[in-house]
Amino acid sequence: ARRRRRSSRPQRRRRRRRHGRRRRGRR
């Protein structure tokens, strides 16, 4: 899992991700 840094200002919007890895190309 990825750790997020706590931001100084509270987050108003939540972003919803459906499929976590959607990147083009292969790793």
Curated annotation (Swiss-Prot):
Q: Where in the cell is it found?
A: Nucleus; Chromosome
GO terms for molecular function, please? DNA binding
Tissue-wise, where is it found? Testis.
Q: What is its main location?
A: nucleus
Instruction: Give UniProt keywords alphabetically.
Output: Chromosome, Developmental protein, Differentiation, DNA condensation, DNA-binding, Nucleosome core, Nucleus, Spermatogenesis
Species name = Acipenser gueldenstaedtii
What Gene Ontology biological process does one annotation of this record name? chromosome condensation
- Give the protein's recorded name: Protamine-B
Annotated GO CC locations: nucleosome; nucleus
